[in-house]
Amino acid sequence: MSAIEKFDRLARGYAAHDYADPARYTARRADVALALGPELAAGSTVLDLACGDANMAEPFLARGLRYRGVDGSAGMIEEARARLGDTVPLQVARMDEYEPPGRVDMTLCLRAFYYPADRGAFLRRVAAYTRVKLVFDFDPRVQDRKQIVCELHENGFGRVELRPFFLPQRAAPPAPIRAALLALEQAGPLARAALHVRGIWFCAARPSVSPART
């Protein structure tokens, strides 16, 4: 079974069964994506690659941004449209082949950075249509941080910023635990040590060249 077929089968009620607290988790991810790297102005455009059921749409819309979602699974896009209607543009397309109709301010790629078979080509494509920053996450126990930073620099990106993220996806910890996890994210060497066991990196990369395309 291909990844697309898998997500077609999982699409119905995806957020409810894949996240313990979907609203809190997506809101926190949106806040981290916006805080990391260059700031976005109100009304900026966010392109969400491999968006799944577009569960990131609501937090970005609530923060005054424009959202566009793309996913290779027709089932996921159908699930997103059932919830969002025509409020945001949604499209079925492979993330490593898609090109938006115009440049976007932020390209988002969550839980999907490992999908493109040719990551260099993918990064160059994204750098060409992204004005401000690419934001993605990755598991440091699976993907090497230094290698990823090198690939970004070699394929159209300049300044790279990273920060740990420890809020769990499939558990809903009480407020004191959430506060402790947030403090751990800002604990420097201790946070980096914790990433050997749990958590992910969030990364924001600024395109090194701004093409003339509008």
What is each of the regions a protein language model found here?
Residues 135, 150, 166-214:
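A C-terminal cap/extension of S-adenosyl-L-methionine-dependent methyltransferases
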Residues 106-118:
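A short SAM/SAH-binding and catalytic strip from SAM-dependent methyltransferases
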Residues 1-39, 43-52, 184:
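Conserved class I S-adenosyl-L-methionine
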Residues 158-168:
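Conserved S-adenosyl-L-methionine
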Residues 53-97:
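Class I SAM-dependent methyltransferase SAM/SAH-binding core
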